[in-house]
Amino acid sequence: ANADSVIWENTANSSTSNYVLKLNGTDHITLKNITFKNVGANYSQKIVLSGVTDSVTIDSSKFIGTVTNSSSSNYVSIYGYDAAATGLKIKNSTFTDGGWYAILLNSNNSSSSPTGLEISGNTFTNTYNGIYAKYFDAVTIRGNTIKGSEMYDYGLNLEYCDGANVIEGNTIYSPQLTYGIYLNYCQATSGNEATIANNLISVEDHGIYLNYYNYYQNMYYNSVKVRDSYALFTYSGSSNNTLINNILLTESTGDAAAYFYNTSVVTNSDYNDFYTAYAYPIYSNGNKTLVQWQAYGYDSSSVSIDPFYNTDSTLVPTSYILDNKGTLIADITDDMYGNSRSVTTPDMGAMEFTVEGSALAGSYTVGSGGDYDSISTALSDLAVYGISGPVTFNIQAGTYDDAVALGQVYGASATNTITFQSADANADSVVWENTANSSTSNYVLKLNGTDHITLKNITFKNQGSSYSQKIVLTGVTDSVMIDSTKFIGTVTNSSSSNYASIHGNGADATGLKIKNSSFTDGGNYAILLNSNNSSSSPTGLEISGNTFTNTYSGIYAKYFDALTIRGNTIKGSYMYDYGLNLEYCDGANVVEDNTIYAPNLDYGIYLNYCQAASGSEATIINNLISVEGNGIYIDYYNYYQNVYYNSVNVRVGYALYTSYGSSNNTLKNNILLTESTSSVAAYMYNTSVFTSSDHNDFYTEYAYPIHYSGYKTLEQWQAYGQDSSSVSIDPMYDSDSSLVPASYILD
């Protein structure tokens, strides 16, 4: 009863001799405790099945093949092409090395596929692929282990396998595998569903992949981790499937945890954990947050929580928040290890687990001798345990070299907020830093869908030579506040976004507030925000009371509506492109009381496709702009922008420029000066740009203060019905930095 003691072997050298044992229509045979070995250089099949067989059992055997990463079927250990093998059982055996698949079975009988196939309790190591079955109905694949660094394509691959298949209790841990479990045209029926349950899948790309036309597949209690794609993928034609009590995690920063081809793929989906390092855990006709997916009527009790798997090979969750979050499924009473499931609060995933601890609430000290010795350990507990009340982390003086990513914190709300702040209310005393050397590590703090968090009185520092982002926002966030902080970057004149201090490309950040902070050095923009949400742009963005020094450009916002940018100072001789740049920012924006003094800037305030409405106008008011190129630049299709009481001084370009498609704007009480001897103070694309323009001062060293359909004197411009009370007087600004007029005439 020892497979090692009997070695049945062949060294095949041709396709006709490529077997150790060939069963052609053989019935009722058992092969037990035997080692089958075929190490031919190009041919390595061991058992070959052909014809119609019944009740072949292969038990407690070993299969040793040729070490290869070939995808040729010549290396398959158990090969059955045209094998209508009813009652075939392959169990308790080991498969080592080989190519293409360890087991490849294709009955080629689509009209009356054989039944009773059972593959159970086997171990597959470095066999390129695991198991392939085609045209076998009501198969059972249970308790197998598929592992190894030389596995490449499929763990389990079933095609046209109909009926009540059972795929249960399998471990697929192979870091190179493209697919864990792959199904194609596997069709069960109502009342006779297939089951995919209690499987542990840890692979490279896809965990569970339902390709075309798979019906009535019940996916319960699976634990999945993938590194580079979707934990669950469903495709065209699949329907009436069920997804309950699964943990689906991808480490990808660009993919959802689950891809639903449409909302008909699953008829019942709930009590799942969809977690991704990307901003959106679900894809269904576009990227979706869990809340957006729930609006379709699915997953009302599901979550998006990092399970904090203990290792890639065992996938035991260590998240306190995730404990006891499943729901009872009557037909599945045990986990993959045979432990009884809780009858009231079972766990999601392949195994029952218990995590001791409690949710955080109250105040904690971070630093030497505190409750947490580092910021990263505090953030880890936030993620693992969640919160049950307001939480404040008081950080002791010191330098903390902690690059940390934080996702959604369970329990956070408008009442239960999270605050990280220096203990002595002094930003200089707490330096939170990183020296990034790649795009993937380019942050000090990354907030991925994090809500209701305040960062106060902290210095964020990232001085990587090519990467210098400090706070990175991704996903859908609500009520993030950054207050009284300092941002120190790399001295550079690069326009690369790798140097942006606050970077949010794809950050759908409602209620984001950045205030009373200082930004020093950097490239591209100090603050770069693009929600990428054109249909329902976030609101409540406030950037106020900040100082930007030599940050190449100041503030960029795209697809943020009704924003406020107030009381900021943008200055320095290393500012080159934009002070403020707003694109597709609609509604009643307020751009007010900002000082932009940077002698090399191309644009002070730049607007593109910013569209307000009558009765809810945007305001650009009380701004001081002293730059090189253009002061206020109203580019394409900007509506209802009220431009009041601004002082502008430019050296080369236009103090005011308007372009195609803009209309219904108002221009009043502005001083618009250019020092250029060849440029006008104001360039009017047409007379519709401003429906009302008056009480302005247009002054230039050039002969004509206005351009509209050619160069115009003020009187010629007034003939079009605009600016009857405006003037063209040198304001005699006291200095380029303060722009206080000294002209008695202008008073």
Language model regions located:
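Acidic glycine-/aspartate-rich tracts in secreted/extracellular proteins
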Residues: 2-3, 251-253, 274-280, 326-329, ...
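Acidic Gly/Asp/Thr-rich repetitive segments characteristic of extracellular carbohydrate-active
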Residues: 293, 337, 358-395, 399-405, ...
